[in-house]
A protein has these predicted regions:
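Flexible, solvent-exposed coil segments and beta strand-coil junctions
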Residues: 40-47, 69-77, 126-135, 177-189, ...
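Extracellular/periplasm-exposed beta-strand and loop segments of Gram-negative cell-envelope proteins
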Residues: 53, 120-126, 135-146, 176-182, ...
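Residue-level detector of the transmembrane beta-barrel scaffold of outer-membrane proteins
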Residues: 49, 77-79, 106-110, 162-166, ...
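C-terminal outer-membrane beta-barrel translocator/porin domains of Gram-negative envelope proteins
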Residues: 44, 92-93, 139, 186-316, ...
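Single conserved hydrophobic/aromatic residue that forms the stacking wall/gate
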Residues: 2-9, 13
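Transmembrane beta-strands of outer-membrane beta-barrel pores
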Residues: 52-59, 68-70, 82-88, 111-119, ...
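Outer-membrane beta-barrel "beta-signal"
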Residues: 347, 365-376
């Protein structure tokens, strides 16, 4: 996995009422949710969301999460929010959001405890690693026990700019299994099979624009950070990430969405689960890892409208996608770029829950996935 998972941004909502006066003049009245108003009703909201996935790489994993949102006298747009979830494969997760009353600053607390079934794929380092197609999928799987705590503080600099400062305290322990590929790379007494603690610091700068009606999203994000092994402080590394994403609207129903992302590690003292990787949808997770990575994926999306039925509002659409990317690793000479291609269908019901079916192929094989829910 990539070395940093940034917190999701939280929108700030403002109610705007417009009144018509004499002489065709207009005034705008804003109700600022973050101001104290004793007439506001104090209440809380509890919601439940199913969450599941079937993936030809990961297998089946079902779960759910509960969201508790408190609306006090001061809101931006709420007073605070807790989300607690469990997934059969990933384990327990918690996400807390605590916005400042002016709506311009937010504190995030994220934590997770992996389940005993949690794993990551490991195929070795480099851009030319073998796919081990003749082996069973378990051969490249590594059971990984993790505990993570990741606080972050986010502030709005200007209307379209957000700055996030984050920290991390993580624990990893890879399970030693004799008949797995990892055992051929790391010796029996290698520290990778012991409990390792890591501390990290970093910052992310994000710009999100909506410049034109035909370009409703243009976003760039830059991250710089540093991680250190607490048991072996000499094993530490700085890193940087950058991404650029956009949506182009050709019509009300036809859009093009794309994301480019690059990762650079500035030292060699990292573990395989901290390496730079590429998310190509036709390959297994972490199929290629290294010291630097770059990839781009793009989708053409067609909104097919609504399906009439007597039970629930149902929207659906089609998409086709193409991905490419590669990694770089010291001492390896490779000119290969990896590609994947495919498509699928998505369904939204109750205007809230989404299911997505996708199929993507590559030089290794193909990957089929079915997703349900909103994600965590």
């Amino acid at each position: 996995s990539t070395p940093i998972k940034s917190s999701a941004a939280s929108d700030v909502y403002k109610r705007q009422n417009q009144y018509q006066l004499n002489h065709s003049r207009k005034i705008h009245v804003y109700d600022k949710d973050y101001k104290y108003d004793y007439q506001k009703i104090k209440y809380h909201k509890i919601s439940f969301t199913p969450w599941g996935i079937y993936d030809s790489d990961k297998g089946i994993s079902l779960g759910t999460f509960f969201t508790y949102t408190m609306y006090g006298f001061k809101r931006a747009p709420f007073t605070y929010q807790h989300r607690i979830g469990y997934n059969y494969l990933k384990g327990f997760m918690y996400a807390g959001v605590f916005p400042n009353y002016d709506g311009r600053r937010r504190l995030y607390l994220n934590a997770s405890i992996s389940s005993p079934r949690n794993f990551e794929n490991f195929f070795g380092f480099g851009n030319n690693t073998a796919g081990y197609k003749e082996e069973k999928k378990n051969y490249n799987r590594v059971k990984l026990r993790t505990y993570m705590f990741n606080p972050s503080f986010e502030m709005d600099l200007r209307k379209e700019e957000v700055m996030t400062f984050f920290g991390s305290l993580d624990m990893y322990k890879a399970k030693r299994t004799d008949d797995r590929y990892i055992y051929t790379v790391y010796g029996e007494d290698h520290p990778i099979f012991r409990t390792n603690y890591f501390v990290g610091l970093g910052a992310t700068y994000r710009i999100t624009k909506q410049p034109y009606s035909w370009l409703p999203l243009l976003e760039t994000e830059w991250t710089a950070g540093w991680k250190m092994n607490l048991k072996k402080p000499e094993r530490n590394f700085p890193y940087a990430q950058g991404s650029l994403s956009w949506n182009v609207r050709f019509s009300d129903r036809f859009t093009w969405a794309s994301l480019m992302k690059a990762t650079v590690l500035f030292d060699n003292d990292y573990e395989f689960y901290q390496a730079a990787t590429i998310d190509l949808r036709g390959f297994r997770d972490n199929r290629f890892i290294g010291k630097q990575s770059f990839y781009q994926y793009s989708d053409l999306r067609l909104d097919m409208g609504k399906l009439k039925n007597p039970f629930t509002p149902l929207k659906y659409g089609l998409f086709a996608g193409f991905d490419y990317g590669r990694v770089w690793f010291p001492g390896e000479r490779s000119h290969s770029w990896h590609t994947s291609y495919g498509g699928g269908i998505w369904l939204t019901f109750l205007n809230k829950f989404t299911t997505k079916y996708s199929w993507f192929g590559s030089t290794d094989s193909f990957r089929f996935a079915f997703e349900l829910g909103l994600g965590f």
